[in-house]
């Protein structure tokens, strides 16, 4: 009788340990998935991405006028997807606009093909360029929309969920 009681208690103890272990594993797995559900890209981080893009776009543009973002949309899933419309403003581009601009970034690449420009920015950081950004904020858009050069840019934000930051951003711009 003693052997059967000890065997039953041993099996019961193993069963209880198994239940605790499986519950803890399921809880840990669920918590890991919550990282992907949480949108940590707030408006300030997205504004920094837009500012970096406006700086790069205007720096590498051969146009004599500055361009700014007219319309924007952004959706966050596992990656962030968005669309912006770059439109020419009435403000002329001059070299002093980019004076004392501090662009903090790890790496960026620019690739041009007819009708498309691709900007890839790794660790976008931010851009410190008060003069250019304040000028863009105060520049009205060109009003003659039928003659307006527009570019639609689709972008993907590649987040770093561990660091709760943006790892890279890729913009693909197409002339309309």
Swiss-Prot record:
Disulfide bonds join 129-139, 153-173. InterPro entries: Cystatin_dom, Cystatin_sf. One of its GO terms (cellular component) is vesicle. Prostate and lacrimal gland. Residues 27-31 form a propeptide. One of its GO terms (biological process) is cellular response to dexamethasone stimulus. Glycans are attached at residue 71. Induction: By androgens. Belongs to the cystatin family. This is Cystatin-related protein 1.
């Amino acid at each position: 009788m003693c052997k059967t009681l000890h065997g039953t208690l041993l099996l019961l103890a193993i069963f209880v340990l198994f239940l605790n272990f499986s519950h803890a594993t399921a809880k840990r797995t669920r918590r890991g998935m919550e990282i992907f559900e949480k949108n940590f890209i707030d408006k300030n981080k997205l504004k920094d991405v837009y500012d970096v893009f406006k700086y790069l776009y205007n720096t590498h543009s051969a146009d004599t006028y500055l361009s700014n973002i007219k319309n924007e949309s952004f959706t966050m899933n596992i990656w962030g997807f968005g669309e912006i419309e770059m439109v020419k403003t009435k403000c002329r581009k001059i070299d002093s606009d980019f004076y004392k601009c501090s662009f903090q970034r790890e790496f960026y690449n620019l690739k041009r093909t007819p009708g498309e420009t691709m900007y890839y920015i790794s660790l976008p950081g931010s851009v410190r360029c008060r003069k250019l950004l304040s000028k863009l904020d105060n520049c009205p858009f060109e009003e003659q929309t039928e003659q307006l050069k527009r570019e639609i840019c689709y972008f993907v934000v590649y987040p770093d969920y561990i660091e709760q930051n943006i790892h890279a951003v890729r913009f693909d711009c197409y002339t309309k």
